[in-house]
Amino acid sequence: MGRSIHYLAVAATNLYENTRSSVQKYINAKDKNEIVFTKGATEALNLVANTLGQKYLNEGDEILLTELEHHSNYVPWHYLRKSKNIKINFAEINEDGEIPIENIEKKITPKTKVIAINHLSNVTGAILPIKEITELAHAKDIIVVVDGCQGAPHLKLDMQDLDCDFYA
């Protein structure tokens, strides 16, 4: 996109950017430039994890996941664990198949740099309280990455309200 002055290329770029604006309005993102198109959530989660791994995470840092994560939100962090000697902690599910915020809070340590969680579990149907988790995390300068594959088609999304750092 934006690679030519030919009228067809300009028309394609305009359509592409109009789509970005439509998505921005639909999910109430602050700015259309926050919208990054990928082939899917797996690619998006890999992109975020790899970028954070290269630019932000260091040996000894910790990442917090939950026991409900889909493989696509586990594997990229697992690779970082191996390549950068980063620790992964897991917040446990309760007997109802949910993850109370207390289970997340008790797993946060001073070394926690990223919380990577799903919005809605495709295993139990549990909806995680993303806004509350983000508030807790941001108070401790922790980045929040949300796997929204199940949440996006089933929940009304408001990125400004959720305030997470990345939503795939």
Annotated model-derived regions:
Residues M1-A168:
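Pyridoxal 5′-phosphate
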